[in-house]
Amino acid sequence: WPMVATPPRRLIYVFNTFHPKVLALTARGPGLRPWPRTEYVLISAFQKKMLGIEGEIHPSPIDIKRFHPRPPSPDQFAPAARPLVVGRLSRDTADKHDAQDLALYRTLPAEGWQVRLQGATSLREQLPADPALQLTPEGSVDAADFLRGLDVFYYRTGDHVETFGRVVFEAMACGVPVVCHRHGGYADHIRHGENGFLFDTTDQAAAILHQLRHDPALRTSVGTNARRTVEDMFSPSALQARMTFFRS
């Protein structure tokens, strides 16, 4: 039908992947009649840089009413009151996990962490059976409830590169300090040590987790700033500006 349809006034393509083939397919209108130039809406500056194309950047929407912080607890400044929980959430596929993290997961329980990995049953044969190391299927707990149950969110992927990384922002919206590998679209919004943490190596990640474990005030301040960051990203004025782009 596009071959015979009347060309639209504007042609906007919301592009949220890294696949260059998609660019070739969408750069030109179909048929013999002239179509308007394709306008791209991208979801991160990281994606824009990696692809080397022009486009409007609109972060992938997050429901910040659903993903909200848990109420303050009396023991939040008492590290010995309960085991601290570090965890991550993703699809249960091998490309979502980095093999370098296996060694880290093995050591964290001995340091006093409880580790919760939802969407990690694919790692079961590579990790020891340990009550403090929980591997659960993808979707076994509601995402918002799972993230609110963490003290720290940890994230690094394997072959899969996050164009945006929704789950990182969902964790930030829940007021959870995030510790993430630097290579991903989420890194555009993380100010290291202020509203989250970025690392390049496993040793750096381990050092950050050690610091957070022993500094409850830092966990609280970074989590609070993380929530504010996401609120700013999806404020009424920011959402209105994005709608104005489509309506113009």
Regions found by a protein language model. Give the residues of each.
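Short hydrophobic beta-strand element within catalytic cores of glycosyltransferases
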Residues: P177-C180, L198
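Extended catalytic core of nucleotide-activated donor transferases of GT-like folds
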Residues: W1-P36
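A charged, aromatic-enriched C-terminal amphipathic alpha-helix characteristic of glycosyltransferases
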Residues: P72, P216-R247
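Donor nucleotide-sugar binding/catalytic pocket of nucleotide-sugar-dependent glycosyltransferases
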Residues: V14, F18-P20, W35-S73
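Acidic donor-binding loop of glycosyltransferase active sites
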Residues: R148-T163, V176
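Conserved catalytic-core segment of nucleotide-activated headgroup transferases in glycan assembly
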Residues: I62-V141
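Short alpha-helical segment that forms part of, or immediately flanks, the ligand-binding pocket
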Residues: A144, R166-A173, A187-D188, E194
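Conserved acidic donor-binding segment of nucleotide-sugar-dependent glycosyltransferases
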Residues: H192-D203, Q211-P216
